[in-house]
Structures are given as structure tokens and as C-alpha cells.
UniProtKB/Swiss-Prot annotation:
Name of this protein: Stress response protein nst1
Listed Low complexity bias regions: 11-30, 64-73, 169-182, 721-739, 913-925
Keyword Flavoprotein: no
Annotated region (Disordered), positions in chain: 1-212, 288-364, 421-467, 507-941
Compositionally biased tracts (Basic and acidic residues): 91-109, 116-128, 507-526, 536-674, 931-941
Subcellular location: Cytoplasm
Organism per entry: Aspergillus fumigatus (strain ATCC MYA-4609 / CBS 101355 / FGSC A1100 / Af293) (Neosartorya fumigata)
PANTHER family: LD36051P, STRESS RESPONSE PROTEIN NST1-RELATED
Length: 1153
């Protein structure tokens, strides 16, 4: 390993603190300052600071240094001199602490593993440390404090302790020799040597090596190099230095002085470099054997020889070149150097003032920044540091050597003590970089120059000392550069090893990663395989479950289908069973219908037989009546003759008794005859009952009755028949039984007596008798003639209501606005009703014939329209008091009424047995005899007319006399009801239209008035309407059986028969089917019939259309529905089938009066 001999020489010759340190300072070894013993004994003010003049203090130091040099020259070596000349202070404790505490608090291992010594290390450590000059970034590994003063004090305290310890333990190892024989460095301690050298290489790590290990490795590396390799390293350094110097000189001055400097520098450099290499060879050859044996390294003797001048000369020389070193310090531009060397300042500055301490610190930093940079960081190259700024550091050092050399020449020639001053004053070259200087350094330089001027007289440097000084400086620089190259080569080798090792480790790491990844991949594959197996097992399990589920579903489906099939079979059986039951029911129903039809046929046969017997009986009765009539005519003839005789007798008597009154009576009779001749002939009576007690003497004559001849009555056949305003049913005398009560008389006006000459007494008695008869008088059913009926004489008006206009005596005037209210009682008579429909206050109706009115039926609470069979009549107004009336004509004995309310013509009718009329009696002058005779005459006339006139004349002897025909639509009586149609033949209550024959234009109905309609309905239309109604009823009653709308024709026919009025002929199946084939229109109910034939029979279905009266029949009431009257033969005047309700909307156009 290359030794660092320059460390000792540099420490003793080039340290700036050798001339400017405190009293305690002495030559240093790698930063260790040792105070001489004599100075320590003579300086009791070590720790006591005292204000001392700075210049005086420096003189004392220089004087002490000169004394020490003299002692060295005389051969007396003190402890301090031995330390200065290379003797080492051995401190076992310190070696031990350095060895074992490489990583302790005083040592910080940098990135590359090198540890550098700090203050207090001995010369051996300094020697070893010189081979590892630089650390990373050129920084010291000690921790830095933040304050400048604290760093100084800390370093001074540490150095004081090390000085004391070194002084106590140091021993001089050898004496100096002028003949270049240098003392050897002290041997290393046994534990240090064994730890550093004999450590196995395999146990050493190339990554983390301690300072001692690295130093040993560097030594080993240098010793292993060959001659050529070593020369090549030196050659490279020499070429580099020369190249840099030449490049620098191109920019320098070209004057003679500068040229001499360049020449001197080149020559000096070549000589010194060659000499230094020779010394290195000598050292290497000398140290080869001892190194292998573990002996300590011995530096070359030449490098360790003491200086040839006194301490004073050394200090003076250093002071002369201090400004250049200051410039080098500025050019380093390394702030870490200042910080790292703050702690290595001398501790002798404490007794002095702060100004002196600052100046000395600046000097110390300047000196150490120049040549001690290699000891702080191994990564900063010394050559790069010195050659920075185009090698100004090295060039300045060479210039210093050249200046010294020139100074020596001038001193020998002129003997000038202050040669350096004249040199600088004569040659005024500025520095290479003026801005490198600062004010503080200028002050230091000025203070140094002043001190040097004061000491010029005392300092005298021999030429040999100056040569030695320059040689030593170059050796230090060359050694640094060389060591740096060796260190660089070593680092390259270590870097290569480390790179190789790193590659190997990376390969191993990669291999391990690959193995790890392969292992992970295998494990992942295993997990995947496991998951796949699990998934496969799950899939198999799911497939098995699905198969089981499918099998269960299939079984359940089969079971369900089986159940459905059973249910279907069961439903089919039930359907067949129901069908069989339905067929059985249909058969039973058909059987019942056939039985019913049979019974109906038998019933009709029985009825036909009974009618036949009745006709036979009728013929017998007619024959007997004819015979009786003949006999009666004979008796009447005889009686008439008798009456005529008696009348003539009475007349003769009257003529004699009353001569003057005969003309008046005759005139009255003529007026009465004239009035009777103006009336229409009396209609055929429908009831032969006569009113009891009524006689021509109802209106009593005020004259006394006398015997007057009776006028002959008009013959009965002369009475004309009503043309079309009376129904055959109401005009037939055979439907009513003749009355045998002698008290009942005809209402005909011809029954009125001609003579009215009864007395007052007899009038009073007859009045009471007539009143009794009126109380028991039945309502006559025979319609009275509308003409010829007027108020009798003396009854011009009733209650202020005017009489009828002339010629219309039968038309009773309507009441005024309050016509619906009963009139107030009239004072015209005790029993006379004020007018038609208004009963008297006593409840006794007026006699028939007066005003042409009919009394109000008892119990009626609302006014009724007049019977439709009467053309001229007045409105009926309910009375407050109604008295039951009896004796109304009875109805047909075979057909009872089915109406909602009895007709006013049939109220309180009592059936009476048919009997023969009373026998003909002789005419008498009494009322009863006259009445009886009139009854017989009227009966004969009616029977004769009944046999030859009306509908009876159209019938054959074998036919049954029916009440009406379907093709006829004759007006009939209005049945009390809720509604009334426009036609007088329709069924209902008060009409919306007034009576066109009435005297007033008012109607009982408040909705309006209008003309009348004449209903006209044919039998096919009526049958079709009944079939439509039957189909609708069947759809309503049995929607399930007739869901398709088809019904059995027999069933429909039965319903039609039920709806058919009883007075109409039966409808056959063929007739109904033929009528169903007709098209529907607005007259016959609309719609169409569909007939379907199959093996079970014929079925009919009604399909309505827009012409059909679907729901409401437009206000009409269909027979059989709620609110409709039950069809009956007692209402023959309604016009046949369907006239009361259905055909209201199909009535004929209105007819005028």
C-alpha cells in the first residue's frame, strides 16, 4: 500500500497554525495539536483568558518555535519535537477505541464504508488515514453544529483533551537524521493488527467495510500491482499535472518574471515527481517483506526527515505564502471544507479576544482547505480539487515554489532580508481570479504581511531549507494525486467486484423470484384444480338434483294429467247426466205441454159444446119470446083499445072540466114532440133493467092531473142503430140478462109521459118514491144518445155555467179553470147534481138524461175521461161525497173482467139470472102500469134488433158469438189507468189532447191538447208483437238454457197463448211460424226471426234491430209486464189484441170531428 509520508511533513511545515496558533498549539499530526511541556508549564493562563496584544503573542509563539528548532538541531529532541518529526504517541486506549468504535459517535461511516479519523487520533492513524483522504462529497463524518462559536469551543475542548492525553502517553521513537534517515512509525497494537490484517477475506463484506478493513484492502491492492501498472498510474498523474499547468500558463502573463516562473515550475515538477516516485519505489520494496509478516508500514526516510530549518524559519516561510493559500482556499468553492475543519481549529485561542480568534480561524481554514481536503472525503479527487478552475490550486503552489526559488537567488545576490516583499512589490500581477478574494481574507493577508515585515529581521531561511520546503510541498501534492489515483483504481476494482456481486445477487434474487413465482403458480394451479374439482362436483350434484327434480316434475305432471283426465271424464259424465236430465225434463215438459194442449183442446171442445147448447137454448128462448111477443101484442092491442076508450072518456071529462087549458097542453105536447123528433133514434139498449121509481112524472106538472087520451108511441123497429161508435159487445142484448124488476124503467126519452098534470100531493109522494129509487139506481150501461139530451125546461144553467149551444144539446160545457175541483153545492134543488160528474151535496146523482151526463162512480178519487164509446160527454170531476150506487148492469156471464179497475159503466154490477120479461098487463093511467108496458115494449124491440142487427147477423148458427175481431179497431171505453194515448180507443187515463166534441178546449192533462188517433192493428201484427214479447220473456226467464237465443217453438207458442187475450181466437203453430217469416218494420215491432230445425225439433230466435222497441216500448206497456192490465173479455171496446198498450205507438193517423 502506498504510504502517506507527506502527512507528517505537511503537518509540520505547511500548517498555517504552526505560525499563528495559540500558545498551546504545536505541530499537528492529522489535525492533532500537541502543546509542548515547557509551554504548558510556563503558561499558567491556559484556561484563563487575558487580553494580550496579538502581535506580541505571535512573536512569542515564533520565538518558541525557533527555540524548538534549535533544540532539534542540537540533537535534543523533546516530546513535542518527536511528535513533529514523525514520532507517534501511542495510546492503547485510543487505538482500542478507534478499532472497536469505528462506528462510534466519533466516527460516521459514509456511503462507501470509509470512516475517517477526527481530532485526537495518533500519528499511526493519521498515517493510515492519509491513504483514504476523501469521503463522500468531501465532508467530514462528524456531526455539524449550527453555531460557529459552538463548533470552535467543542473542537477546542476535544483537542485539549487529546493533547493532554498524547503528552502523557507519547514517547519519542527515534531521532532525526540529516542524512535522510527517518524514524519509523510506531508499530500498531496487536489487537489492531490482528483485527485489520489477519481477518479472513471470506468474512469481509464488499458492501459494508470498516475504515481499517478498507485501508488494509487498499494496501493489499497496491502491493499486488506490478511495476508497469504502478508506473502507468504515476505517468498518468504526471501527464495530467503537466497538461493542466501548460493550459494554465497560456492565460498567464508573458513577461520575463512569469516565464521564469513557468520554467521553474516545469523543471521543479519533473524533478520532484521523479524523485517522489523513486521514494515510493524504495518504500514499496522496503515494506514488501515487513507487510507480509505483519510489521507496521515504514514510510520512506526522505519523506519523514525533519525540516532543515528552525521553527521560526518554517513559520516565516508559511507566512510568506499565506496569501496564495488564501486564494486557493477561495477557489475550492467547497463549503463543506470550512464546516468540516471548524472543529480542528487550535484550542489555544481561548485566552485571546474574539478578533484574534476570528483571524486565526480564517488562517487555519485557509491552510487546511488547501491540503487537507483529501482527508475528508474519498469521493472528491485531489487532482480534481487542485486542478479546479483550470488548475489554479496546483499552479499557485508551483508559483510559490518558483517564487521561493527566485527569492533564494535574489537573497544570495543582494542579501535582502525582505526578499519576498520586494518580489511582491516589484511584480504586481493580480490574482487569476480577483473575485475569489473577500474582505476578510484581505485583512488576514495584510495582518500576516505586517507580521512578516516585523519578523524579517529575525527570520532567515537558508536555501536548503527553502528547497526542502518546496520539495515537501510538491511531495505532498504529488502524493495526494497519486494516492487518489491508487484509490480510484481500487475503487474501480471494488466497484467492479460489487457490480459483479450485485449481478450475482440480482441473478439469485431473480432465481428466487422465479422459484417463488413458480411455486405460487403451482399453488395457484393447485387451487384452480381444486376449485375446478369442487365446481365439477357441484355441477354433478346440481345435474343430479335437476334430474331428480325433472323426474319429480314429470311424475307430478303425469299425476296432474291423470287427475285432469279423471276430472274431464267426470265432467263429461256429469254433462251427459245433465243432458239426459235435461232431455228428460224437456220430454216431461213436452209431455206436460201436450197434456196441457190436450186439456185446452178438450176445454175448447167443451166450450164449443156449451156454446152450441147455449145457441140451441137461445133459439128456444127466441122462439118462446116470439110467441110471447105475439101474445103480448095481442094483449097490448086489447089494452090499447081499452086505454083509448078510457082516454076518450077521460078526455071528454077533461074537455068539459077544462076548456081553456086544452090548447095550452096541446101546445106543450107539440113542443115536446118536436123536440123528440130532433133527437137521433135511441141506440140499442145493452141492459134491459129499468130504473125503479122513474116515471114520466119525475118532473111533476103544476096542474092537477086529468084524464087525457094517451098518445100512441113510436114503433120500436123505427129506431136506427148506432153506426160505428158502439162495440158489438156493448150492443149485444144477449150478454146482459133482462131485468124482472118492475121498478126499473128505460132511460129512453120516449118513456117520459105526455101528460104532466099530476097533483101536488101525488107529486110529493112520487118525489119521495123517486128519491128512493135514485138511491138504489144502478148505472145504466146503455149509452145515451148525444143529441136530443138537453136540460129540461126550467134548468137553463147550473151554477152559472152556460148551457150547450143550440143544436148541440148533448155537449156539456167544460167547467172553468178550477174544473178539477168539486163545485160548491147548488141551491137549485135538493137532489139535482150541478153538472155531469159533480154529485149533489146530498150525494144523490142527477137523474139520467139531464145535461147528457153520467154520475161519478163511487169511490173515485180522481177525474176520469169519459167512456170512449160516447162521442159527446163532459169531463168528470170527483165529488167530495160519493154514495154507492147499485143496480148497474151485469156483465157477460162467461167472461169475467180482468181490468185493473172496473169501468164506470160496470161499477157495482151484480150478475142476475136470465129470466123472462114480465107479462103484458092492461094499460093503466098509473105510472107503474105505464112503466110496465114500456118495459115489455122495449124488451121486445131490443130482442128483435139483437137477433137481426149488429154482429149477430154475421154469425152462423153453429158459430160462437165472439166479442170482436182482430181486424177491427173500434173506439171503446177508456179504462182508468196511469196513461192515456192520443186515440180515444187507447187505454189510459186523462188524454194529452182535449175532447174535440167538448165545449171547452181544456183537458184533464196539463201537458197539452191535440187531435185524436184511430188505432188500426191487424191480427198478423198483433201476433208478431206477441211472439216478440214471448221471446224476450223467455230470454229473461231462462238465460242459461237459451243462451244462444233459440227457444222451442212449442214453448214460444205456449207463452203467446198465455199473452193472447181470452176473447181472441187461438193461434196455431203454423200461423205463428208464417208470421215469423215476415220482415220487421216500425209497425210490427221490427227485428227478424231465425228458425232452426234439427232432430230435436224446431227453434226460433228473435234478433232485434233499430226498429225494435227494445227496452221501453217508447212509453207503452206490453201485456204481461208490470203495470199492464190483464187481457180480459170484459174490455171488448179496446179494439182487440194489443190495442190497449202495444199499439199506442202504432195507432192510425188522427181523425177530425
Amino acid at each position: 500500500m502506498v504510504p502517506a509520508p507527506h502527512t507528517q511533513h505537511y503537518s509540520s511545515s505547511t500548517m498555517p497554525n504552526s505560525s499563528s496558533t495559540t500558545a498551546h498549539s504545536a505541530p499537528t499530526t492529522n489535525g492533532d495539536v500537541h502543546a509542548p511541556k515547557d509551554h504548558q508549564l510556563s503558561s499558567p493562563s491556559d484556561t484563563v483568558p487575558a487580553p494580550v496584544n496579538r502581535k506580541k503573542q505571535k512573536r512569542r509563539q515564533k520565538q518558541a518555535a525557533r527555540l524548538a528548532e534549535r533544540q532539534l538541531a542540537n540533537g535534543h529532541v523533546s516530546t513535542d519535537d518527536a511528535t513533529q518529526n514523525g514520532s507517534s504517541h501511542t495510546n492503547p486506549e485510543r487505538h482500542h477505541s478507534d478499532d472497536g468504535g469505528a462506528d462510534g459517535p466519533d466516527h460516521e461511516q459514509p456511503a462507501n464504508g470509509d470512516v475517517y479519523p477526527k481530532d485526537g487520533q495518533d500519528s499511526t492513524e493519521a498515517h493510515i488515514d492519509s491513504q483514504n483522504p476523501q469521503g463522500p462529497n468531501g465532508t467530514e463524518s462528524s456531526q455539524k453544529s449550527t453555531g460557529r462559536k459552538s463548533k470552535k469551543k467543542k473542537g477546542k475542548k476535544g483537542r485539549n483533551g487529546s493533547h493532554a492525553q498524547g503528552d502523557e502517553t507519547s514517547t519519542p521513537m527515534s531521532t532525526p537524521s540529516v542524512s535522510m534517515s527517518h524514524p519509523l512509525p510506531p508499530p500498531l497494537s496487536s489487537h489492531l493488527a490482528s483485527h485489520n490484517i489477519l481477518k479472513p477475506a471470506k468474512n469481509r463484506s464488499i458492501w459494508n467495510t470498516s475504515t481499517q478493513e478498507e485501508r488494509e484492502n487498499i494496501k493489499t491492492f497496491w502491493l499486488e500491482l506490478g511495476e508497469e501498472e504502478r508506473r502507468q498510474l504515476v505517468k498518468v498523474e504526471k501527464d495530467a499535472v503537466l497538461k493542466k499547468m501548460k493550459e494554465q500558463q497560456r492565460h498567464s502573463c508573458s513577461c520575463t518574471v512569469c516565464g521564469r516562473k513557468r520554467t521553474a515550475i516545469e523543471e521543479e515538477l519533473e524533478v520532484l515527481y521523479d524523485a517522489y516516485y523513486e521514494e515510493l519505489e524504495q518504500y514499496a520494496n522496503h515494506n514488501q517483506g515487513s507487510f507480509e509478516k505483519g510489521s507496521p508500514m515504514v514510510p520512506p526516510p526522505r519523506l519523514y526527515q525533519p525540516p532543515l530549518r528552525s521553527p521560526g524559519q518554517h513559520t516565516r516561510t508559511q507566512g510568506q505564502f499565506h496569501p496564495s493559500r488564501g486564494r486557493i482556499h477561495e477557489l475550492t468553492e467547497d463549503d463543506d471544507l470550512e464546516e468540516n475543519y471548524d472543529e480542528e481549529e487550535d484550542d489555544g485561542d481561548e485566552p485571546y479576544s474574539d478578533e484574534e480568534l476570528d483571524e486565526e480561524d480564517e488562517e487555519t481554514r485557509a491552510a487546511r482547505a488547501d491540503f487537507f481536503a483529501f482527508g475528508n472525503s474519498l469521493t472528491v479527487k485531489v487532482a480534481d480539487d487542485l486542478l479546479k478552475n483550470d488548475g489554479k490550486h496546483f499552479i499557485d503552489m508551483m508559483e510559490q515554489l518558483a517564487e521561493r526559488r527566485m527569492q533564494r537567488e535574489e537573497d544570495t545576490q543582494y542579501g535582502i532580508a525582505a526578499a519576498h516583499e520586494s518580489l511582491h512589490s516589484g511584480h504586481n500581477h493580480g490574482p487569476f481570479d480577483d473575485e475569489d478574494y473577500d474582505d476578510e481574507e484581505d485583512e488576514d493577508y495584510d495582518s500576516q504581511e505586517e507580521e512578516d515585515y516585523e519578523e524579517d529581521e529575525m527570520d532567515a531561511m537558508t536555501e536548503e531549507q527553502r528547497m526542502e520546503e518546496g520539495r515537501r510541498m510538491f511531495q505532498i501534492f504529488a502524493a495526494r494525486m497519486f494516492e487518489q489515483r491508487v484509490l480510484t483504481a481500487y475503487r474501480e476494482k471494488v466497484a467492479e467486484q460489487r457490480q459483479q456481486k450485485l449481478i450475482e445477487e440480482l441473478m439469485e434474487e431473480e432465481t428466487r423470484n422465479e422459484q417463488r413465482n413458480a411455486k405460487k403458480a403451482r399453488e395457484a394451479q393447485k387451487r384452480k384444480d381444486k376449485k375446478r374439482l369442487q365446481k365439477q362436483a357441484k355441477e354433478e350434484e346440481r345435474a343430479r338434483r335437476e334430474a331428480e327434480k325433472a323426474a319429480e316434475e314429470a311424475a307430478a305432471k303425469a299425476e296432474q294429467e291423470k287427475k285432469l283426465e279423471e276430472q274431464r271424464k267426470k265432467r263429461e259424465e256429469q254433462r251427459k247426466k245433465k243432458e239426459a236430465e235435461r232431455k228428460a225434463q224437456e220430454e216431461e215438459r213436452a209431455r206436460k205441454e201436450a197434456e196441457k194442449l190436450r186439456r185446452q183442446r178438450e176445454e175448447r171442445e167443451r166450450q164449443a159444446e156449451a156454446e152450441r147448447k147455449q145457441r140451441e137454448e137461445k133459439k128456444r128462448r127466441e122462439e118462446a119470446r116470439r110467441k110471447e111477443k105475439e101474445e103480448r101484442e095481442l094483449r097490448e092491442k086489447k089494452a090499447k083499445e081499452e086505454r083509448d076508450r078510457k082516454a076518450q072518456e077521460q078526455q071528454a071529462k077533461k074537455d068539459t072540466a077544462k076548456g081553456g087549458e086544452e090548447a095550452k097542453d096541446q101546445e106543450k105536447r107539440d113542443d115536446q114532440a118536436k123536440r123528440s123528433s130532433q133527437q137521433v133514434p135511441v141506440p140499442i139498449p145493452t141492459n134491459l133493467h129499468h130504473l125503479q121509481g122513474l116515471s114520466p112524472t119525475v118532473a111533476h106538472s103544476p096542474h092537477v092531473p086529468s084524464a087525457t087520451p094517451v098518445l100512441p108511441k113510436a114503433p120500436t123497429p123505427a129506431k136506427p142503430r148506432q153506426p160505428s161508435q158502439q162495440d158489438s159487445h156493448s150492443s149485444s142484448p144477449h150478454s146482459q140478462a133482462p131485468s124482472t124488476d118492475p121498478s126499473q124503467a128505460s132511460l129512453s126519452p120516449r118513456s117520459m109521459p105526455v101528460s104532466q098534470s099530476s097533483g101536488v100531493a101525488s107529486g110529493n109522494s112520487q118525489q119521495g118514491q123517486g128519491l128512493h129509487a135514485m138511491l138504489h139506481q144502478p148505472q145504466p150501461s146503455t149509452p145515451l144518445s148525444p143529441l136530443g139530451r138537453s136540460i129540461p125546461p126550467g134548468f137553463s144553467s147550473v151554477n152559472g155555467i152556460p148551457p150547450n149551444p143550440p143544436g148541440l144539446s148533448g155537449m156539456v160545457a167544460r167547467p172553468p179553470v178550477g174544473h178539477d175541483l168539486p163545485s160548491y153545492p147548488s141551491h137549485s134543488g135538493p137532489f139535482i147534481s150541478p153538472f155531469r160528474g159533480y154529485p149533489a151535496p146530498t150525494g144523490i146523482p142527477a137523474p139520467p138524461g139531464i145535461n147528457g151526463a153520467r154520475p161519478m162512480p163511487p169511490g173515485r178519487g180522481f177525474p176520469l175521461e169519459p167512456a170512449q164509446g160516447f162521442a159527446f160527454h163532459g169531463q168528470q170531476i170527483p165529488g167530495a161525497f160519493s154514495t154507492p150506487q147499485g143496480g148497474l148492469p151485469h156483465r157477460h156471464s162467461r167472461q169475467p173482467s180482468g181490468s185493473l179497475e172496473r169501468s164506470p159503466l160496470e161499477n157495482h154490477a151484480q150478475p142476475m139470472p136470465i129470466s123472462r120479461p114480465s107479462p103484458i098487463k092492461r094499460p093503466s093511467s098509473t105510472q107503474q102500469d105505464q112503466q110496465k108496458g114500456d118495459d115489455r115494449t122495449t124488451q121486445r124491440d131490443v130482442d128483435d134488433l139483437s137477433a137481426h142487427l149488429g154482429s149477430s147477423a154475421l154469425l152462423d148458427d153453429s158459430d160462437v158469438s165472439l166479442s170482436s175481431n182482430l181486424s177491427q179497431s173500434l173506439p171503446g171505453a177508456t179504462v182508468p189507468g196511469t196513461f192515456s194515448g192520443p186515440a180515444r180507443a187507447s187505454f189510459g187515463g186523462p188524454s194529452l189532447f182535449p175532447d174535440p166534441l167538448s165545449a171547452s178546449g181544456w183537458s184533464n192533462n196539463a201537458f197539452g191538447s191535440g187531435g185524436h188517433h184511430r188505432a188500426h192493428t191487424s191480427r198478423p201484427v198483433a201476433i208478431r208483437l206477441l211472439v216478440i214479447q214471448a221471446c224476450k220473456q223467455l230470454n229473461t226467464m231462462s238465460p242459461s238454457k237459451g243462451a244462444d237465443g233459440y227457444h222451442d217453438v212449442n214453448l214460444v207458442l205456449r207463452h203467446v197463448e198465455q199473452l193472447r187475450p181470452q176473447n181472441e181466437p187461438s193461434i196455431s203453430l203454423k200461423e205463428m211460424l208464417d208470421i215469423c217469416d215476415t220482415e220487421g218494420n216500425t209497425q210490427n215491432g221490427g227485428g227478424t226471426f231465425s228458425i232452426r230445425k234439427d232432430e230435436t225439433g224446431e227453434f226460433v230466435k228473435f234478433e232485434p234491430d233499430n226498429n225494435s222497441a227494445a227496452s221501453g216500448h217508447r212509453g207503452s206497456i206490453v201485456p204481461g209486464e208490470i203495470g199492464s192490465p190483464v187481457p180480459s173479455s170484459s174490455l171488448p171496446a179496446f179494439g182487440g189484441i194489443g190495442t190497449p198498450s202495444v199499439l199506442r205507438q202504432y195507432s192510425s193517423p188522427p181523425m177530425g170531428f
